[in-house]
């Protein structure tokens, strides 16, 4: 995952803070999220190597007799100097709303390259209803922090390899995989390898640990010298109802640095 990061890459197209449409389209409930289907992320600050996930609802699209909607998204990303760093071709797609209603969930994914300079980046998008030709422009900013050791691109998946996204709220009896990357670590001068310790601990809604001891992993080998990051993850079974916090702490023993990421998760009863 971290061997091919470009300056910045858009993985999908989608909008940001809701602004009024020129016609009947609006974008509502816009927020940064922990992964594609995760809960709301409270901040807009990201380290190089991280992924900006944006979720929203599109309201007012023309719905066909079979529940189909057709729309186009255009996107541009600029850096702190207002220089365009990514501008893909506009994408037109058809989605379906078989359960009815007037809202279509949408998402955006933007990867902050490991070489991206710190500063405020701006994401500009335009969503157009192909049936009515009504459009809505949107602008969203996010801050790229200076390059440093950390945990990046935290998300949940249904599979161990991270190919099928999952929500961070699950039904008791189900299981998700929490995926993330360790980035920008130092290397031991003798071995040319990182020396990173990862600690994983779960806490309940009252802030109490759910088990007595944390999961501890150490990474000292197997990372090619041209890599600035490596993936990691673990399985998380939902065994009881409640709200919980997954605390992941990574320590770079070579650089004597540590980084902590907290991911809220929840389990609900089946049925």
What do these predicted regions represent?
Residues 18-271:
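Intrinsically disordered, low-complexity terminal regions enriched in Ser/Thr/Pro/Gly
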Residues 2-13:
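Sec-dependent N-terminal signal peptides
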